[in-house]
């Protein structure tokens, strides 16, 4: 699967889900009650477009070299480009914010994946939801360690 397909698939799926949801109940509820939903699931609609914008920015900065605040983009020198990019505070802040949102997005997606695989059971679901949060947190911590290390000058 290509990167474009990877980005397009969740967009297509969310549009399809919204269409099915609206067709099933064209009249909205008078009172919105979020008893069964968690914060991650309630933020999917707005975190998705922000994560997409982040992916586009990330590709333009680190792959295409179109955006290179702070210094010159050097084709093929990934180490230089990453360090130079993350030395700009707002790039690091944007990256940390977006990856944190990605973590919320992933925790919901991983939890939904377990349910889609039929692993939903009153005994196992709470453990699987905690596993989804732990997996997403590990991914977030791994990815944000890079800009934090550059900002703290651990990586130069």
Where are these regions (language model features)?
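Alpha-helical transmembrane segments of helical membrane proteins, especially in multi-pass transport
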Residues: 61, 87-109
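Divalent metal-coordination and catalytic microenvironments
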Residues: 10, 58, 105
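Juxtamembrane boundary at the C-terminal end of a transmembrane helix
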Residues: 142-156
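Short, small-residue-biased leader/transition segments that mark boundaries at the very start
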Residues: 2-3, 7-9
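Transmembrane alpha-helix/helix-exit interface in multi-pass inner-membrane proteins
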Residues: 18, 43-72
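Membrane-interfacial helix termini and the short, flexible loops that connect transmembrane helices
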Residues: 15-39, 66-73, 110-130, 154-155
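Membrane-interface interhelical connector segments
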Residues: 64-88
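Interfacial and helix-entry/exit segments of alpha-helical transmembrane bundles
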Residues: 32-53, 127-140
């Amino acid at each position: 699967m290509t990167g474009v397909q990877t980005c397009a698939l969740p967009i297509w799926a969310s549009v399809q889900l919204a269409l099915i949801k609206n067709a099933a109940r064209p009249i909205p509820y008078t009172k919105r009650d979020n008893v069964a939903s968690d914060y991650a699931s309630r933020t999917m609609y707005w975190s998705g477009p922000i994560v997409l914008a982040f992916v586009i920015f990330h590709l333009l900065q680190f792959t295409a070299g179109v955006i290179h605040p702070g210094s010159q983009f050097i084709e093929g020198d990934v180490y230089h480009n990453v360090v130079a990019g993350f030395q700009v505070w707002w790039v690091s802040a944007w990256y940390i914010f977006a990856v944190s949102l990605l973590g919320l997005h992933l925790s919901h997606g991983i939890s939904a994946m377990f349910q889609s695989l039929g692993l939903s059971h009153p005994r196992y679901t709470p453990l699987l939801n905690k596993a989804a949060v732990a997996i997403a947190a590990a991914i977030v911590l791994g990815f944000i360690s890079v800009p934090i290390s550059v900002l703290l000058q651990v990586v130069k």
